[in-house]
C-alpha cells in the first residue's frame, strides 16, 4: 500500500504548497472541498503545474497522482479515505476549521489502522491544529475520546509561502513564490515518529517559529497592503517601492522584532536578517501580488491573536514601544467597502453603527483593563470621525 494524504481545501495554497510537497514525498493526495468547480477541475485533469517564481527565473513542476471528493455530496467516501489515510492536512482558512471537523471526526473514529493518523492544519493562525482538534473532540462520542490518541495525533504547524493572485485562465496551475517554510512540531508523535515529508522542518517547540513568521511576514505584508491601498498603489511591490511606505514597514517590523528577540531565543542579528529577507521577498515584482488580495479579511487580521493586536498587546504588557503597529491598525480600520471583500463591508458597518468602545471590543477582543485598549480605542474613534 502506498502512502496517502487527505488535503482539505483545493485552493491555491492546498494545490500549490501542501499538495506539491506531499506529492514530492511520495503520497497519493486526495483533495476534499465543497466547491463543485474545484472538484470538477481536479477530477477531469490528471495533472496540474506549480510554477515557482523568483528573481532567478521560473521553475515548473508537474503534480500527478491525486483525486478529489466533494464532502458536501460524498461525505461517506471522505470518511472512508480518512479511515485508511496516513496524513490529513488542511488549508481552508481558520474560520472554516469548525466545518471540516465533523467529517474528520467520523473518519478518525472509523480507523482501525495500527499507526495513528497525523493531522496537521496548515493555516495562518497560531495553534490552528489545536483549534481543529478541539472541534473534532466536540464531534466525537465521549466514550471514544480517551482512546482517540491511538487513532490520531495532532501537530501544530507554521507555514510561509506567498501565493499571489493568479493569472486568469490558468485553471488548476499555480504560480507561487520559490521561498517556503513549513515547520511542524514533532513532540505529539512521540515514539510512533512523525510522517516522512522531507519539505517539513520538524521542531520540538513551534511557538518561536509561528510568532516570528506571523509577526514578521504577515504583519509586514498586511502593513504594506493597507498603507499601499490608502495611497492608491495597486501592487505590493509598487507600494514597497515608495520610500515612505518602506520606512513605515521597517518601523513596524522593528517593533515586532523587539518582542521576538525579548521573548524567544532569537538574536537581534538573526531577526534583522530575517526581516530583510522578508522585505526583499514581498518586494518581489515577479510575484505580481496586489494590495487588495493581501489586505482582504480585515476583521480577521484585526482580531486578538492576529498580526497587529497580537504583538502590540504583548509589547504593551511589557511596557515596550508599539506606535508603528498602531499605525497599521489604523490603516486596517480604513480598509472599508472594498469590492469583493465581505469583511471590509462588515468593518464599515461596525464602525458606522457602534460606539468606539463597542467597536474596539468587538474588533480586537481586548479587555478594557488591557494597556493596549485605550490607545486602540483612540485610533478607532479617530477613524470613525474621519480624521486623517
Swiss-Prot record:
It catalyses: D-mannitol 1-phosphate + NAD(+) = beta-D-fructose 6-phosphate + NADH + H(+). One of its GO terms (molecular function) is mannitol-1-phosphate 5-dehydrogenase activity. The active site is at residue 213. Its EC number is 1.1.1.17. It is an enzyme of class 1 (oxidoreductase). NAD(+) binds at residues 5-16. Disulfide bonds: none annotated. Catalyzes the NAD(H)-dependent interconversion of D-fructose 6-phosphate and D-mannitol 1-phosphate in the mannitol metabolic pathway. This is Mannitol-1-phosphate 5-dehydrogenase. It comes from Aspergillus clavatus (strain ATCC 1007 / CBS 513.65 / DSM 816 / NCTC 3887 / NRRL 1 / QM 1276 / 107).
